[in-house]
């Protein structure tokens, strides 16, 4: 699974740097995108006895289904990588804001402002050597291209929350 993720990240990187992308901007059911992103991790949730807290959000997002799915999938992958007990909560605390919150190890305050930089792994990534420093950078690039925002809140020992702002900024529906 890890090799597949690295290959996917390289392909995303190359596609984002090309002159044309394959964005299909439409109105999509966010719950369908979330379920498709969660599905590949079901075995890991079960095997590691981590809980997934998720209630359908009943939200329609103007986005690209495949690319937003990539972002959600990568955020889930990171959350699972750094969470040893407890679980992950997917919610919409404010209209148009998707939250993915974990009970993992959290991110050091000095690392938090840099986690979306290309190649930055931070203390956690350097310690366990399971980080390429490219995933969250790609998530930021995809969100920027889609007119979405992505931000992080975290505290060591308390977990991390990634928020994806889905309100439309400059997107035209096909």
Label every PLM stretch briefly.
Residues 18-23, 56, 60-63:
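Conserved micro-motifs of the catalytic ATP-binding
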Residues 87-97:
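Short beta-strand/loop element within the Bergerat-fold HATPase_c
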Residues 79-80:
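Short helix-loop "hinge" at the ATP-lid/N-box region of the Bergerat-fold HATPase_c
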